[in-house]
Amino acid sequence: MLPTSLKTLVLLGALLTGPLGPAGGQDAPSLPREVQRYDGWFNNLKYHQRGAAGSQLRRLVPANYADGVYQALQEPLLPNARLLSDAVSKGKAGLPSAHNRTVLGLFFGYHVLSDLVSVETPGCPAEFLNIYIPRGDPVFDPDKRGNVVLPFQRSRWDRSTGQSPSNPRDLTNQVTGWLDGSAIYGSSHSWSDTLRSFSGGQLASGPDPAFPRNSQNSLLMWMAPDPATGQGGPQGLYAFGAQRGNREPFLQALGLLWFRYHNLCAKRLAQEHPHWGDEELFQHARKRVIATYQNIALYQWLPSFLQKTPPEYSGYRPFMDPSISPEFVAASEQFLSTMVPPGVYMRNSSCHFREFPKEGSSSSPALRVCNNYWIRENPSLKTAQDVDQLLLGMASQISELEDRIVIEDLRDYWPGPDRYSRTDYVASSIQSGRDMGLPSYSQALQALGLEPPKNWSALNPKVDPQVLEATAALYNQDLSRLELFLGGLLESHGDPGPLFSNIILDQFVRLRDGDRYWFENTRNGLFSKEEIAEIRNTTLRDVLVAVSNVDPSALQPNVFFWQEGAPCPQPQQLTTEGLPQCVPVTVIDYFEGSGAGYGVTLLAVCCFPVVSLIIAWVVARFRNRERKMLLKKGKESLKKQTASDGVPAMEWPGPKESSYPVTVQLLPDRSLKVLDKRLTVLRTIQLQPTQQVNLILSSSHGRRTLLLKIPKEYDLVLMFNSEEDRDAFVQLLQDLCVCSTPGLRIAEMDEKELLRKAVTKQQRAGILEIFFRQLFAQVLDINQADAGTLPLDSSQQVREALTCELSRAEFADSLGLKPQDMFVESMFSLADKDGNGYISFREFLDILVVFMKGSPQDKSRLMFTMYDLDGNGFLSKEEFFTMMRSFIEISNNCLSKDQLAEVVESMFRESGFQDKEELTWEDFHFMLRDHDSDLRFTQLCVKGGAGGTGDIFKQSNACRVSFLTRTPGNRVMAPSPRLYTEALQEKMQRGFLAQKLKQFKRFVENYRRHIVCVTIFSAICAGLFADRAYYYGFASPPTDIEETTYVGIILSRGTAASISFMFSYILLTMCRNLITFLRETFLNRYIPFDAAVDFHRWIAMAAVVLAVVHSLGHAVNVYIFSVSPLSLMTCVFPSVFVNDGSKLPPKYYWWFFETVPGMTGVLLLLVLAIMYVFASHHFRRHSFRGFWLTHHLYVVLYALIIIHGSYALIQLPSFHIYFLVPAIIYVGDKLVSLSRKKVEISVVKVELLPSGVTYLQFQRPKTFEYKSGQWVRIACLSLGTNEYHPFTLTSAPHEDTLSLHIRAVGPWTTRLREIYSPPVGGTSARYPKLYLDGPFGEGHQEWHKFEVSVLVGGGIGVTPFASILKDLVFKSSMGTQMLCKKIYFIWVTRTQRQFEWLADIIREVEENGSRDLVSVHIYITQLAEKFDLRTTMLYICERHFQKVLNRSLFTGLRSVTHFGRPPFELFLDSLQEVHPQVHKIGVFSCGPPGMTKNVEKACQLINRQDRAHFVHHYENF
């Protein structure tokens, strides 16, 4: 009786293995209660994994590693493996076996080993113990290159081992460690199912029932290429249970033998038990075949191999460990290798030995071993009879002598790994022993209780002493270093030596006694005693006879020996003579034939942007054609609107500017007018009777162009539709000039030359600008470097330009005024001494000298002379009135005629001249007595020293100018204490380094928030890159990819992490609603939300650069992967590749186009090329719709990115980690935007204001609620319904309509200005409608929470305050109770021209502010070094005008205009004196960061005092 615990274990094993019932017969259950598993599990019920496939080898002797853990011993600790192979195993073939062992017994031994052990599978991560071939090796290095290295990849090991010296590395056995027929049925259930036919209990056969079917992809047969022919693939390889069962036809024949024997047993069982099903038949046949196999291997082959009989079987020993030892692997395989002959005979049952053809006319007596490795469709083994003849031939052939010699077929021509077709079997076995950490020969003897030899000569007396001497020399005469494998070979002669014999016998005994399913174990219930006896009497000869039907007399009784008198002796002991030569080693170039295709593929990918550019160019051409058609229609409609004598043409303004349509009118008064398409006069040319007019006609390019050269003017270049149109215009011009004395001179030249000779407006302006600078340099002693230099071009056109004179229009433009202004008329009349209607440069210089260097008396006299219109030496009231009127014209006519008369009277009365009707120059100068210092412009100096720019209009620091207030009687009062408002002047730094430093400081100052955000974002991206780069470079678990493509994987994975982050968080820059909300929070102080679009572009550009680097990294990876062997690729990509021995890696095109990451990567590059090209500024200008449509490919982009990373080729998908949160936010933001309906908004009013500003007033939707200072996005239906642009609202929340002031600075705003030109009929019906989206942005809403608020606007940053000021005035006029009692509004701007459009808004604020709630100051920072004559010459008038009328001459406003920068610190300090009872003052600034920083700094300095606290809120534009 079994113990209770053992019964329990047996029952557990039965449940786990699954008892099988009868398949459908009427017999009693035919299967035993337990069927042996295929994978070796649960053979031992206590130690379930013992002997299972994948279990580790069990050492007999402690491991011998270099580090005691896993590092193999290598040179120089041990000799070179190839040298050892040459020294120990080299020799001639042809010596017969000492005991006449047959070749059949030899290859049966190999078959048994394939059933027991398989450690050839390379391990992962890949580690190499390469074999370095000595220079000049006759086989592997015949060219004496000295760089030949045969790769040897270490075998697969148990990952739980190799951790410490107490747990060294152990290899794993890939097959079951039991003698259970796994070489016949496979080592797993799935493998066995693939081999079965599931019909009649048989194994599946091919077209010929005597052969199994060919190997299939689902069956992991080893498919190494034929080293002789290079042929590969599964075709011609049979499906066996042993993975390497097709290595040689001789091993293949034994596999076929057992295949046929199983099917024979199944047929017999089916005849005996016709009611059994397939499973019963298969399992009973398998059981019988395994038992027969065990019997032959242990009781027939092993004694013949060892010349020892194993001990009698004493029953199953459950505590016996049958695990295969690495020492057994080395001993058995290496000893068998000494017996392999160079060829194998084939014969029939009549003892006829076959001949085989070879090169030439001769024949070969045998199959050459070296040329039959992994051979496909062997012509000598086509039929079952051929297989039988091979088996009979092996039974008659005597193997090689069991000694140290290994024939060259193995030693020099063994199938090689990777790129090499051949390798050294012995050297590979030596490396394999070192890989397994085998002990030395002496250590193994001592561990097994055997006596080690004392010296080299005592090792084996039968070995040639020269061999021992050579071996000893390689080991430095140290016998203790001799390795187990070589020592075992040297001790063997005729039989295995004592070491190998003990190891092999011990292994087989443990396998038998520890196997619960051993056929002699009567307790397992597999066989009865009679069946066991029958099996014990079955021999391999019986199996051969049964499956081949040969005459038993054709075989000796024991086919493992050939004795004298046995049938069919071999013709001779085979040598290499008479056999075909072994095919030499070849080196495979994996990339051969792929270079051109790989290059073309990369070139095609690089051409994606080029193709996208071509597409964009085609789209742009179509858009330009449409634009030309529109222009053509416009010209046709323009013809109908122009006068009858108008001639349509295109004016060419210059070489880098686009031509535009004009209409040229020739008027009877000999004037020529050029009008634009809106009939606005662009230019008027007065043809004087005495002028010589030159007309140059083009003689090429259709003869459509003409050049009109008028003296003292820049040239006019016109391009007509045809030569006929041009000739018609020439005729009209000739008719106009017929009465002129000089007449019209006409010439012809080539069009290119004509355009080159033309003096354009831009050229004229450039020459005049430089000349003006030279004049000022002479007048003001300005440094020549600051003034600029004259052009060095001495061509005729430059000389003509320098000698020309200024027209009235050019003179007005130089002053920044209109030609029809009275001031221009007076000044021009005064300067034009010769009265020819032009001012020469000398005449201009005379005026300039007085203004710049003259004394106050000279300047007042010049002004007096200017307005002494009748020249009588007196300035009448009427002339004084005219002078004041000219000033008022400059200031936008802010005063009526009556108001101006009142001002003149008050000025006369204030000076004591109320009774005079005329003023002498002395009276006039007395009237300007208070402005003597202002008239001293002689202090204008830009040399940079004391008295430089900082002295312009210099005021005493002690002077304080108040915000002037008006009393009900219109008298001016100055409340005390007063505010300090004088402008601060800055000195210019002239040094190059100082200027660069200042520029850098200003840049950092202006973009500090941007820099911080970009730095943080870049740091995160760099950190992600560094993390992945470090991980794959140093810290990743060994996967071989970092060893295979170190640079490529670092670049590709590092950039992939950064790109994933960038493409994820770039979505946040497009969440407008979220940005609008966050701008109203404290985060706006730290994050420049207004720069979201710029940040979007920056991220996109950085991402595409990294994408290119990522692609380059993968280009390197693809090349390296294409030249790496399959064994290495299996380690790198275990989920993609299976190492089946085929060696050849996938080609480059597989990586590019047949993998998900490759194909999606190519598509991603294509999408990116399209999106980025169409998003360029140039193309957006030509076709915004194309940009908009292609940018919607971002949906495809993200889909491809997700698919690209989901394949997990290198690592698990990680894009979702970055993408999920931004995507949810972005989708939510989009849903909010989609919830707003697009309503067409009608435009109510349009005004074209100066400085290119367009005023739009449009309907306000009923549900539109906003705060003053917010902005909206509008789309003009005529310019595209999807193209939105943001603008700040300048209307107040209480107004019924919305308004915008849009400055034309880009293509869209320019086109908008053209489209909204005032219609002819004066109605708004023809105005295109708008789409409105918003409001967005932050409103400065806390101004009303302070009793005193200061609003500071810089440049265009004043626009939010326009809405706030109007809102403020409305609330105050409505009597709304507000905490705020006083508003100070300061606007800092470069030049007065920038605020012309805002004057009406500020004037409205001033007129409606009944309680003087708002005080306005304007600071103009542009100084006279810019040579703005108007700023210089009108300064005196501004101060006097402000004093007399309490209005600015420049703006017509009560606000004071200053020149320079506001003194924020002094102003805020004085504000505390004006409002001593106020304890908290709000400061709101909006503009460039430099200005808001100065305000912030001033507030911080003032807040250090124990007085009023200034709370600063700012917003940067």
From Swiss-Prot:
Keywords assigned: Calcium, Cell junction, Cell membrane, Disulfide bond, FAD, Flavoprotein, Glycoprotein, Hydrogen peroxide, Membrane, Metal-binding, NADP, Oxidoreductase, Peroxidase, Repeat, Signal, Thyroid hormones biosynthesis, Transmembrane, Transmembrane helix
Protein's membrane topology: Multi-pass membrane protein
EC number, UniProt record: 1.11.1.-, 1.6.3.1
Bilayer-crossing regions: 600-620, 1011-1031, 1047-1067, 1101-1121, 1155-1175, 1186-1206, 1208-1228
SMART domains assigned: EFh
Activity regulation, short description: The NADPH oxidase activity is calcium-dependent. Peroxidase activity is inhibited by aminobenzohydrazide.
Pathway: Hormone biosynthesis; thyroid hormone biosynthesis
Region described as Peroxidase-like: spans on this chain: 30-596
Maturation and modification: N-glycosylated.
Family label: In the N-terminal section; belongs to the peroxidase family.
Protein function: Generates hydrogen peroxide which is required for the activity of thyroid peroxidase/TPO and lactoperoxidase/LPO. Plays a role in thyroid hormones synthesis and lactoperoxidase-mediated antimicrobial defense at the surface of mucosa. May have its own peroxidase activity through its N-terminal peroxidase-like domain.
Name the record gives this protein: Dual oxidase 2
